[in-house]
């Protein structure tokens, strides 16, 4: 995956906000998904 992140540090503030917004939208879309809930539970137990 490192290949795709080669210019990770060059992202503009606007681009970061767009990405964050998309992630939040995806997260809310999966809110009631049992698999997503299991993944979150697993992350919280670490």
Swiss-Prot record:
<dbReference type="GO" id="GO:0030435">
    <property type="term" value="P:sporulation resulting in formation of a cellular spore"/>
</dbReference>
<dbReference type="Pfam" id="PF09575">
    <property type="entry name" value="Spore_SspJ"/>
</dbReference>
<keyword id="KW-0749">Sporulation</keyword>
<dbReference type="InterPro" id="IPR014220">
    <property type="entry name" value="SASP_SspJ"/>
</dbReference>
<feature type="region of interest" description="Disordered">
    <location>
        <begin position="24"/>
        <end position="46"/>
    </location>
</feature>
<protein>
    <recommendedName>
        <fullName>Small, acid-soluble spore protein J</fullName>
    </recommendedName>
</protein>
């Amino acid at each position: 995956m490192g290949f795709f992140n080669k210019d990770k540090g060059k992202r503009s503030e606007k681009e970061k906000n767009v990405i964050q917004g998309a992630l939040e939208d995806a997260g809310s879309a999966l809110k009631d998904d049992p698999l997503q809930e299991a993944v979150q539970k697993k992350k919280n137990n670490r």
